[in-house]
């Protein structure tokens, strides 16, 4: 009974984190992230209701750079749209934190989760707190002189969310999945190594994807596989190792492409390793990996070719998390065998 409760709690928490990540991506893609110019963790749980309160929020927004530089002249109705998207993202974050924290306190005092097992849950709790501050720290970067948030802060904001999800999902499968029974003579060293490498390259690629989103780097060089008839664009050939390139949309898109190739190659090798073992469950994971990889690659290419359509770009982000989840599951099963 207790194990079932923890499983349901972790499952709901994971779903909520994914939903918050996806809505956060949509918020960025629609340029809605700077519409709420204050951080009110408690009193900000309710949106404006009256016409006067909407006018007051709109007046606050007009005092900041984004209105004057990017959205000058937008109507109140247009402002409501971007405001509500950012509001939903913040509200989801608060609800997700509560869904995680309140049951965690209950489980701890009822001794449902033992002291020896608490460390990952405490780390996730700490990261939830950090994430709230990181979200505002990111937004604040676009409320000063520039009407754009720092792409680096955006990337760290996303990565913290993914790490939280990773911890919760790992605890979920640890609580839910049975140990994999494989003959002792089976060599699992190679698939274990490549599952670890795959997790690493997917993390790096998610981080790079956030940099692309933060710099609107998906709106340039909308061709594939070449960038304006060249594998390496002319703008970065002569100064490829210059640290300033990390603020250059051309360089960031190029590195994200390289990351995509790396993810594809590593996951394909992992799939081959899993299929060679000829174990039903690992073979099933291999097929899931094929589907997730195909979806991730195809949505990434379509996102680029069609200048970042919001729905496809959001699906692309979602499948990055799904792909990571399958690899984590794979790694857990191999380690547990």
UniProtKB/Swiss-Prot annotation:
Question: Mind telling me which residue stretches traverse the membrane in this protein?
Answer: 6-26, 87-107, 119-139, 154-174, 192-212, 258-278, 285-305, 308-328
Which cofactor(s) are needed, names only?
A: heme b
**Which GO CC annotations does the UniProt entry carry?**
plasma membrane
| One GO biological process term | heme A biosynthetic process
Q: In which pathway does it act?
A: Porphyrin-containing compound metabolism; heme A biosynthesis; heme A from heme O: step 1/1
Give the first-level EC class, as a single word.
oxidoreductase
What's in the keyword line of the UniProt record? Cell membrane, Heme biosynthesis, Iron, Membrane, Metal-binding, Oxidoreductase, Transmembrane, Transmembrane helix
Localization (cell):
Cell membrane
Question: InterPro entries under this entry?
Answer: COX15/CtaA_fam, HemeA_Synthase_type2
Q: What is its main location?
A: membrane
Q: How does it sit in the membrane?
A: Multi-pass membrane protein
Regarding protein family, the annotation reads: Belongs to the COX15/CtaA family. Type 2 subfamily.
Name of the featured protein: Heme A synthase
The beginning of the lineage is:
Bacteria, Pseudomonadati, Pseudomonadota, Alphaproteobacteria, Rickettsiales
Please state the gene responsible for encoding this protein: ctaA
